[in-house]
């Protein structure tokens, strides 16, 4: 149920971006995976690149993406509302929190790198 709610939240983010904080909206065109593989939505096409860095760093980057933090928090709140308090739910939610949060400034720099790497 957690993952269903998480993915439904992503659908809501893309369909109704005006309902979300600016940080979520600005991050939506970007996908940054655990291994540094990145994608940017350019019109209707996804363009890819790979940025250098460790898997540990990019795991935190992925987990700190504003749209991921929002989707995980939404899934947690929704499941908790529907099924009540649960140690298993708390543990699952904790698993999807970054060890080190990435700052908005660092995201701006990363998104700029992806922009440059996916041009042309």
Model-derived features: where do they sit?
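Short pre-active-site segment immediately N-terminal to the catalytic Zn-binding motif
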Residues: 1-4
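Catalytic Zn2+-binding segment of zinc metalloproteases
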Residues: 7-26
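Metalloprotease/metallohydrolase-associated module, dominated by Zn2+-dependent proteases
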Residues: 25-119
């Amino acid at each position: 149920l957690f993952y269903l709610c998480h993915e439904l939240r992503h659908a809501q983010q893309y369909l109704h971006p005006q309902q979300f904080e600016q940080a979520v909206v600005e991050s939506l065109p970007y996908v940054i995976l655990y291994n540094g593989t990145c994608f940017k939505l350019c019109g209707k096409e996804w363009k890819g690149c790979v940025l250098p860095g460790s898997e540990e760093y990019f795991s935190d980057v992925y987990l700190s993406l504003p749209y991921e933090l929002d989707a995980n928090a939404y899934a947690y709140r929704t499941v908790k509302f529907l099924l009540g308090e649960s140690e298993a739910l708390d543990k699952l939610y904790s698993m999807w929190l970054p060890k080190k949060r990435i700052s908005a400034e660092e995201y701006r720099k990363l998104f700029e790198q992806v922009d440059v790497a996916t041009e042309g």
